[in-house]
A protein has these predicted regions:
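Residue-level signal for mature regions of secreted extracellular proteins and peptides
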Residues: 46, 191-194, 252-255
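Papain-like cysteine protease catalytic cores
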Residues: 30, 71-210
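Conserved aromatic-histidine-acidic binding/catalytic patches
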Residues: 41, 45-46, 50, 56, ...
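Active-site nucleophilic cysteine motif
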Residues: 46-61, 142-152, 346-349, 384
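Hydrophobic alpha-helical scaffolding
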Residues: 48, 58, 97, 117, ...
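Exposed substrate/partner-binding surface patches
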Residues: 1-37, 41, 75, 85-89, ...
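Active-site nucleophile-adjacent alpha helix/oxyanion-hole segment immediately C-terminal to the catalytic cysteine
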Residues: 38-82, 154-157, 161
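Carboxylate-rich, divalent-cation-coordinating active-site regions
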Residues: 53, 198, 283
Length: 417
């Protein structure tokens, strides 16, 4: 005879085992997803030394610009006594304290320590003390503007590298203010063309100015908006800010143009073009403005793309001075974002988002956490770093050995791009 009770028990056991197996699979997948969600990158956080979040946010952003960070990290150590004369020369030339300090050396050590990933957070105290010495305006522990700090940092690095790495590259298209290129100008350097046209005789004047970043106004029709617009309401986008920057404008009466043809000041129009785009396009949204005796913050949410920022509309073709239409060469992807939290220019807090190997991370001083692109897109960006999909670096910008710094030009390793 058939034992129905036995068969029923076996069936229940099989169903329970099957259910347990599915539950275990579900838990395993959840643990795997949680691991990827909360995994730490190889980079470490940066301790806040007392209102130094502005510096930490800039450093974490730059550390995730692969070509820039890789170059600085692979520079030879400048601690060798042979280089002492050059260090003193730079200090005297820039009217520093006279101490043998180099910002590029401390930045190199900081970036190397960041990417060792052996500590949850490292202290940037040595770098900050050098910054105090070479850029006195950042002395003390007051909150500073991240954009101003970034500009001073890059300018100083450019000056030091010009003195330390005197390799011939005057024919490079990435020329800095002094007619020579460094990794700073090769990565961040672009060229603006301003066109001023007299409204009386139509004579046009053109001027070219190098830039390391572009400061964009938030259009007036959006500047009073604080929260993200509801469905159906117009949204301020990064393209709106770029369009405002490059649109034709008539100069005010207080800015009358001295026309060489009319021989007097005349009403005129002005327009900006980007004549040459940088490899890393740094866009600064002007969130602080003066009102009476204080700086107010513009809280407008600005929508920005994470992938595929097409800059062809705003750039001139160098050969024909027409709008560029290069397929893909002027398309950028987001690499990092700096965010200011708070209402005042001299207060609040800075954090940064940056992507590494396809994963986004949030850098909040000592704390580094994984996040998704949607989280990044919801932030109120202050500074955006976009990397060109097709990086173009001159062959002369390569990492050199110690002998190169001492005068013998031996190439040790080209940057991999």
């Amino acid at each position: 005879c058939v034992n129905h009770n036995h068969n029923d028990s076996r069936g229940k056991l099989e169903r329970r085992l099957s259910s347990d197996s599915l539950e275990n699979d579900r838990k395993h997948k959840k643990r795997k997803n949680d691991y990827h969600k909360h995994r730490r990158p190889r980079t470490s956080g940066l301790r806040n030394l007392g209102n130094t979040c502005f510096m930490n946010a800039v450093l974490q952003s730059l550390s995730n610009i692969q070509e820039f960070c890789g170059y600085i990290k692979q520079l030879p150590s400048l601690e060798d006594k042979v280089l002492k004369a050059k260090k003193i020369h730079i200090s005297r030339k820039t009217r520093d304290t006279g101490e043998d300090v180099l910002l590029v050396e401390e930045l190199r050590k900081t970036l190397v320590a960041l990417w060792q990933g052996t500590k949850g957070a490292i202290s940037p105290e040595s770098l900050f003390s050098v910054i105090w010495k070479v850029v006195p305006r950042f002395r003390g522990y007051q909150q500073q503007d991240a954009h101003e700090f970034m500009r001073y940092l890059l300018d100083r690095l450019h000056i030091e590298l010009l003195e330390l790495l005197p390799y011939p590259n005057n024919n490079s298209p990435y020329i800095g203010p002094k007619g020579k290129s460094t990794i700073v100008t090769a990565i961040f350097g672009g060229l603006l063309q301003s066109e001023v046209s007299c409204l009386i005789c139509r004579m046009e004047s053109k001027k070219h100015d190098p830039f390391l970043d572009l400061s964009l106004d938030i259009p007036a029709q959006f500047s009073s908006r604080i929260t993200k617009p509801k469905d159906g309401e117009p949204v301020c986008t990064l393209l709106d800010c770029l369009a405002s920057f490059t649109e034709l404008e008539e100069l005010e009466d207080s800015e009358l143009y001295m026309c060489n043809n009319c021989k007097q000041r005349q009403r005129s129009t002005k327009k900006f073009w980007i004549r040459r785009l940088p490899n890393v396009l740094c866009l600064h949204l002007k969130r602080f403005r003066w009102s009476m005796f204080c700086r107010l913050k513009v809280e407008t949410f600005v929508e920005f793309p994470v992938k595929g920022l097409d800059m062809n509309t705003y750039v001139l073709n160098n050969l024909h001075e027409t709008r560029g239409n290069f397929s893909g060469s002027n398309v950028y992807d987001l690499a990092a974002v700096i965010v200011h939290h708070g209402s005042g220019a001299g207060s609040g807090h800075y954090t940064a988002y940056a992507t590494h190997e396809g994963q986004w991370y949030h850098f909040n001083d000592s704390t580094v956490t994984a996040c998704d692109a949607e989280t990044v897109m919801r932030c109120k960006a202050y500074i955006l770093f976009y990397v060109r999909r097709e990086i173009r670096l001159p062959d002369s910008l390569c990492v050199r050995t110690q002998s190169s710094l001492n005068g013998r030009h031996h190439l040790s390793r080209h940057l991999s791009v």
